[in-house]
Amino acid sequence: MGEIIVKEVLTRKDLRDFIYLPEKVHKNEPDWLPPIYMDEWELYDKKKNKSFGYADAILLIAYRDSKPVGRIMGIINRRYNEINDENHGRFCFMECYNDPDVFHALISRIEQWARQNGMSKLVGPLGFSDKDPQGFQIEGFQYPLFITAANNSPYMVELIENEGYTKKVDLVNYLGEIPRKFPDVYERVLDKITRTNEFEFIEFTGKKQLRPFIIPILELMNDTFAEIYGFVPLNDKEKKEFAARYLPILDPKFIKTVRKDGELIGFAIGMPDLSAGIKACRGRVLPFGIFSILRESKRSKKLMMMLGGVRKDFRGKGIDVMMGVKI
């Protein structure tokens, strides 16, 4: 086999190799879920992704015999490190064939890069924030994949452990059936909260009604997500950009909020699982893939809970039960 050459992504061709490598690695895996490539191009664009404003990053791609065989991204999130008194670099969006030599070549280059930039340790997979897919999937490979979670082959776990890495934190996805009848305890909690009239429960019928709530939801997210590993709070500019980007694709009927004395104290955001539509168009939204995704949004029987939180001083009062039952 030829020599492994690791190079930094500097040109548009390099970036194309980087972005589309995973579909080559997973081409024989029928259950693999591609990303939405339109989003991928924006994710790695320093002009469009504002995270580059507070983070240093490097993209590397490994070639063997002039063919791309592996990729990795390194990130130093200065904002996170400052807030949490950390001194770590991150690796993320790593893909390669089942080849220990390629894996080692990539991870060792990121380790070197992190050390050269004053970092004392490396953690990952962890992107710019917790809102990027993070971690390696280590079990549950028999279940369908979905777009917001880790999407890796089982061998990646062995490859990273062989490099001396150990678990930092468990990240858990839950899959559950929606019961036709909720447990009696849920009904009692919901009845009690409703009778007290202490909280104002708000549902939405349209995006015009939802729009004024988006920024308050993101402000509450900053507060309630502070204890989540890897979370980076959004600044005012990012809140506006986040709202502008996601409001068009949110379905108001799957968003629930709770207020106390006019102040937002809880929120839950769900959206239909679009995985089948994304697979059908192979992650290519334009020009016609959007129709597969829109069609799936209407017929999907799975709901993904994307975000949710309750203000700390109101936890344990059944507000999460109220929103869960209603959604």
Spell out what each predicted region is:
Residues 22-59, 63-64, 72-82, 204, ...:
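A conserved beta-strand-loop-helix scaffold within acyl/acetyltransferase catalytic domains
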Residues 128-130, 179-181, 207, 273-275:
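Short, solvent-exposed loop/turn segments at secondary-structure junctions
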Residues 2-4, 150-229:
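Acyltransferase donor/substrate-recognition loop-hinge adjacent to the catalytic core
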Residues 1-31:
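Generic start-of-chain signal for non-secretory N-termini
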